[in-house]
Design a protein with these regions (language model features):
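N-terminal helical capping/dimerization or prosegment-like subdomains
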Residues: 1-77, 239-243, 257-260, 335-346
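Metal-dependent amide/peptide-bond hydrolase catalytic core
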Residues: 2-5, 167, 174-354
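Buried hydrophobic packing segments
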Residues: 34, 107-117, 145, 198-201, ...
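Short glycine/proline-enriched coil/turn segments at helix->beta-strand junctions
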Residues: 39-44, 48-50, 62-63, 119-123, ...
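A structural signal for short hydrophobic beta-strand segments in well-ordered beta-sheet cores
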Residues: 45, 88-90, 224-227
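Active-site metal-coordination/substrate-binding segment of hydrolases
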Residues: 63-127
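Hydrophobic/aromatic beta-strand patches that form the interior of the parallel beta-sheet core
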Residues: 66-68, 129, 154-156, 316-318
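Acidic/histidine-rich catalytic neighborhood of metal-dependent amide-processing enzymes
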Residues: 108-174, 178
Length: 354
């Protein structure tokens, strides 16, 4: 089959998936549909929860392994959609629907590239993995299926990157902060205001800058994104809760940043939700990155998180669609973007020597 036929298959599958609500933790019906198509294309597969994987029939444990990966879950549709988010509509080159851009286009394009590469000469094994719960970094997503997969040497993650290679990705750590005071009547000089107790620490957090800045990822960034305190106007609040969003570059591990904050923010109590989502990258001299450069693609660093953070091997993001369309109303992807992605994946993989 020519690329056009594979593109048609990709578009058909994408429309089917858009029509199936697959918000994180509810991907079972979408996984069923994917399994149906894998059977139709004679691709024996494994399944763990709502994660699916397919390995090449000429598997050789003595060869290195490349994984193509994308996720099947979506976020919830925002209120400002002007269309039915679960009704796939094609208007010319545009396909509208929830998950079309993030990450449906990458999902179907990586699968078609996998199908093509089964018939091309390779010195490596190829594996395709569709993962669940990516949008929430859930325990039943990639981390659940990873122990069941063979050893992987390198991966391409099909996130929307405007088909440019994101060879580095910032890590993420979410911290819950608490300040404590003593309640009292606001009209009298009594009580200890928990909001005021937190102010010095929050001002320090706002003004502090980590010294080591990354060429690809920039500086490690900390933002207070949620704050909750007080019950009514005439009561001095005795507790304050806030959330810190921390985006780390490759120079700072999440554990180090957390311990550093605990030493500096002495008025507040801090609790990290997880340390596992570290910054990740692939060396610029890696054969796959060199193939990207030969193709005229421009490597960059991504501030957003993906399943790449959970991969203990070299990986980078490369996929159709634009990151700015993700999680937005009237989400869309272009058919031409999917076709170009399939062609690009095949170019990178066909001449690759691992």
């Amino acid at each position: 089959m020519e690329t056009k036929n594979y593109t048609n298959d990709a578009v058909e599958l994408l429309k089917e998936l858009i029509a199936i609500p697959s918000v994180s933790r509810s991907e079972d019906k979408a996984a069923d549909k994917l399994a149906e198509y894998l059977n139709r294309w004679n691709l024996p597969h494994g399944r763990e929860g709502n994660n699916l994987w397919v390995g090449c029939p000429d598997w050789d444990n003595n060869r290195p392994t490349l994984m193509l990966n994308a996720h099947i879950d979506t976020v919830k549709p925002v209120a400002s959609w002007t269309r039915d988010p679960f009704l796939p509509v094609q208007e010319g080159d545009f396909i509208y629907g929830l998950g079309s851009n993030d990450c449906g286009g990458g999902l179907v394009a990586t699968l078609q590239a996998y199908r093509i590469m089964l018939h091309r000469q390779r010195n490596y094994n190829i594996l395709w993995v569709a993962s669940a719960e990516e949008e929430i970094s859930g325990d039943n997503g990639f981390t659940r299926v990873l122990p069941l997969l063979p050893k992987i040497d390198v991966a391409i993650v099909g996130e929307p990157t405007s088909l440019q290679p994101a060879i580095a990705e910032k890590g993420l750590m979410v911290i819950d902060g608490y300040a404590h005071g003593k309640s009292g009547h606001a009209a009298r000089n009594e009580g200890v205001n928990a909001i005021y107790e937190a102010l010095d620490d929050l001002v320090w957090l706002r003004d502090y800058t980590f010294r080591k800045e990354s060429r690809l990822l920039g500086a490690t960034k900390m933002s207070v994104t949620v704050i909750e305190g007080g019950t009514q106007h005439n009561v001095i609040p005795d507790t304050l809760h806030f959330i810190i969003d921390v985006r780390t570059n490759e120079f700072y591990q999440n554990e180090f940043v957390f311990e550093f904050l605990k030493k500096k923010m002495t008025k507040c109590e801090l609790h990290a939700r997880s340390f596992r989502l570290h910054s990740s990258s692939i060396p610029e001299e890696h054969p796959l990155v060199r193939r990207c450069v030969e193709r005229g693609l421009k490597p960059f660093g991504s501030p957003t998180l993906s399943d790449q953070a959970l991969m203990p091997f070299a990986s980078f993001k490369l996929g159709p669609g634009d990151s700015s369309r993700s999680h937005s109303a009237d989400e869309f992807i272009r058919v031409s973007e999917i076709e170009q992605a399939i062609e690009t994946y095949v170019y990178l993989l066909e001449g690759l020597q691992l």
